[in-house]
Amino acid sequence: NSSRFSDFGVEVVAEMNKVGIMVDISHVSDNAFYQVMDITKVPVIASHSSARHFTPGFERNMDDAMIARLAENGGIIMINYGSAFVTEEANQYNTKRSDAWEKFLSPEDGAPIDMYNPELRNDRDAFNKQYAELNPYPFATLEQTLDHFDHVVKLTGSVDFVGIGSDYDGVGNTLPIGLKDVSSYPNLINGLMQRGYSNDDIKKILGENLLRVWGEIENGAE
């Protein structure tokens, strides 16, 4: 999408800065991201996005240039654990399943159909279940998830711009092996330790980076 923010859109971002509301750029287009970065006077967050380096073309993740710009802004990218955010294989699985669902629904006359019609939800759930039985889901691993943290740190040269954005409540049964729920956080911490992160680094990743951004946003409010 190459459109520009309306005057009202620019005003909204500026007003969020003014009153101390975080601007979250997960779920926006690349174009919208750069417009936000040109407007905001305080750091922003990507609350549940990962590194597009590992999932080329997947716009819910951030590419290297975006991550670098986010770091310049002082913001943070909070890594999403959903397997489709972590590996290309899982991401392509979703695309192939959607294509199969569309083909399954397509009427013989070729008329357009709304694949996401709420009335078809039960049918879609049943289709997805059968599809998974025939095509087992390629769950990501803890190690592959940790690669995203490493990538951000190496790209920005600092541990200050990455955090945890699990999306435990949003990605359903697609979570990585070893990171299925919050009880798995010791696995994440141990994995970071095994990769050479210090206790102070890990504290930043687990929450201090977000609190730092939060503080800067509050301090920037009028």
Language-model segment annotations:
Residues 28-34, 51-54, 84-87, 170-172:
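Active-site environment of divalent metal-dependent phosphoester hydrolases
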Residues 79-84, 156-179:
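Short acidic/histidine-rich active-site segments
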Residues 64-126:
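Aromatic-lined glycan-binding groove of carbohydrate-active enzymes
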Residues 1-4, 22, 52-57, 132-140:
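The substrate-binding groove and active-site-proximal loops of carbohydrate-active enzymes
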Residues 180-222:
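Mid-to-C-terminal alpha-helical segments outside catalytic/metal-binding sites
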Residues 123-151, 199-214:
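C-terminal helical cap
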Residues 1-24, 28-45, 59-75, 144-160:
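Histidine/acidic residue-rich metal-binding segments in metalloenzymes
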